[in-house]
Amino acid sequence: MNVTAKSEHSSLTNQDVNWFLFDETLWVTKYKEYMQIDDSIAYSMGSFNWLYESNDTVLFHKKDARFETAVIGLSARIKLGFADKYINYICKGKMGNLYYAENKNIDFVFSPAFIYDENQDLLLSFHDNFSHKKDYVLFITEDFGFVIIDHQLKGWVLQRASRHVCVHRKRNMGIAPHMIARYLSALDVWEEKEDMTELESLLAACKQEGGVFYEALKECMMNLI
């Protein structure tokens, strides 16, 4: 996906970046409901995840090509890992606005390799062919940025990721990074082996505190059965 960047203020804020942990999607948009995103397609260009397709949704306004919405599918794509080698690039990122540089809709999917670094509390999709001389991270909010390589949209970065976790539409639940990592690890075991042992262990650990996270985890496990 060809894009350009401008050094200008984005209309999006950190409040518009939501990681729906149990729905396995990352939303970067002013819209609160999926129907609103669906309605916006009439005046948007870019990539959209139609029924039975696996595209990531990345939409730009037809009028001025300005970025508006991203809905990134995370299902079976997040692995626990270390993001140390990317930190320097992220720290040198710049603020701005993203613009579409094509004149048609396309099929677009971010790299399937997503990493969550518990120690850095970073969720990201990064490419090893990143060149510090010409490539950059463009932050459109304080915490969320796109990875631009050779004028193409190639990845993204979410700093302080745990603060953006949403459970049952409630954000910033105070879920610690180590709990997120434990859930992602348990989910990975389920997806690879259909073994619920780790998920059941996590549910038992959360039972005493109860709350929204416990109820959502229990519901998630029931849906998996």
Region locations from a protein language model:
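Amphipathic N-proximal alpha-helical interface segments
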Residues: 57-67, 145-147
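Intrinsic disorder/low-complexity detector
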Residues: 1-49, 58-59, 69-125, 164-225
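A cross-kingdom feature marking solvent-exposed beta-strand/loop segments within repeated
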Residues: 39-53, 130-143
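Conserved mixed alpha/beta catalytic, RNA-binding, or beta-rich assembly cores of soluble enzyme
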Residues: 133, 139-145, 160-177
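Short hydrophobic beta-strand segments that form the core of ligand-binding sensory/regulatory domains
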Residues: 72, 157-158
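Generic beta-strand structural signal
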Residues: 56, 112, 142-144
